[in-house]
Amino acid sequence: MQPRDLSAHAPYVPGRGTEEVARELGMDPEDLTKLSSNENPHGPSPKAVAAIEDAAPTVSVYPKTAHTDLTERLADKWGLAPEQVWVSPGADGSIDYLTRAVLEPDDRILEPAPGFSYYSMSARYHHGDAVQYEVSKDDDFEQTADLVLDAYDGERMVYLTTPHNPTGSVLPREELVELAESVEEHTLLVVDEAYGEFAEEPSAIDLLSEYDNVAALRTFSKAYGLAGLRIGYACVPEAWADAYARVNTPFAASEVACRAALAALDDEEHVEKSVESARWSRDYLREHLDAPTWESEGNFVLVEVGDATAVTEAAQREGVIVRDCGSFGLPECIRVSCGTETQTKRAVDVLNRIVSEVPTA
């Protein structure tokens, strides 16, 4: 007995973790600065931590009330009906739910390149396929409606990442509206706003009252600091009211995750602090790194260093973990997550020294 042929399914490549690098290099994890996964360097809200502790004795019970409470809270936050909010285990869980709701076998999605590999992974898991539109370095990774429409050929789902990972560029509101009014009736625009809290651009969720072909993804992993709990959600058109119950995984969002997310929503001060810190860090990175960078509205900065693998490996040996963007098709670039002031300044010092010493690829 063997699994089906999975040769067309490329595995997801995450940023390297502190424990992984520490074991490999024989270092103390406490001596490492991890800026590879766009996590919140300030951690979760203290209110979320307290909620996790309070919820711990209840983990023997399937989550129902907490899931409902979180759904209703998010619906109220965004001015939607509860049926329009699909809570999921991370934003990637929402990607799966939307794929199940939309794709028939052999349907295609259109996704950005470079971009989040799970868009196409989910499509292929569900017997669909993927084609790409290029967010080009030659154009400073600018995102426009024309860029997408030039590649569009009636795909059932079109993914738009704003802010875009790993570049930090945004799709302006007027460009999104143009897309919503230009694609065919059967096409769903999926706007991935995992990094939306860090951007100035308004959320696509505001458009759901006007357009029935737009859905938006959000997560608690970034600005809210709950990456380890895997909790996110999609906001979908009102006409989709009964679809969630038919496509979601039973009890996929845990009781602890839902309670922590509810508490995190109550701590706006922590989110504001996290966003302000990220904006300071990305400005500092762009101003002080001795290498080309691009304007970013995420909690990270893309940096051109010549040989990303060499720079990444050298930085690790000096205790700074950053993301080699070779897996994004950018072997000359690294992505540096926004850290605390101390972490950011350490990263700049280490990277500037390494970039001056590592030969250009």
Swiss-Prot record:
InterPro entries: Aminotrans_II_pyridoxalP_BS, Aminotransferase_I/II_large, HisP_aminotrans, HistidinolP_aminotransfase, PyrdxlP-dep_Trfase, PyrdxlP-dep_Trfase_major, PyrdxlP-dep_Trfase_small. It catalyses: L-histidinol phosphate + 2-oxoglutarate = 3-(imidazol-4-yl)-2-oxopropyl phosphate + L-glutamate. Keywords: Amino-acid biosynthesis, Aminotransferase, Histidine biosynthesis, Pyridoxal phosphate, Transferase. Its cofactor is pyridoxal 5'-phosphate. GO terms for molecular function: histidinol-phosphate transaminase activity; pyridoxal phosphate binding. The modification N6-(pyridoxal phosphate)lysine is found at residue 222. Belongs to the class-II pyridoxal-phosphate-dependent aminotransferase family. Histidinol-phosphate aminotransferase subfamily. NCBIfam families: hisC (TIGR01141). It comes from the Archaea. The keyword Amino-acid biosynthesis applies. CDD domains: AAT_like. Residues 26-45 are annotated as: Disordered. Pathway: Amino-acid biosynthesis; L-histidine biosynthesis; L-histidine from 5-phospho-alpha-D-ribose 1-diphosphate: step 7/9. This is Histidinol-phosphate aminotransferase. Pfam families: Aminotran_1_2 (PF00155). It is an enzyme of class 2 (transferase).
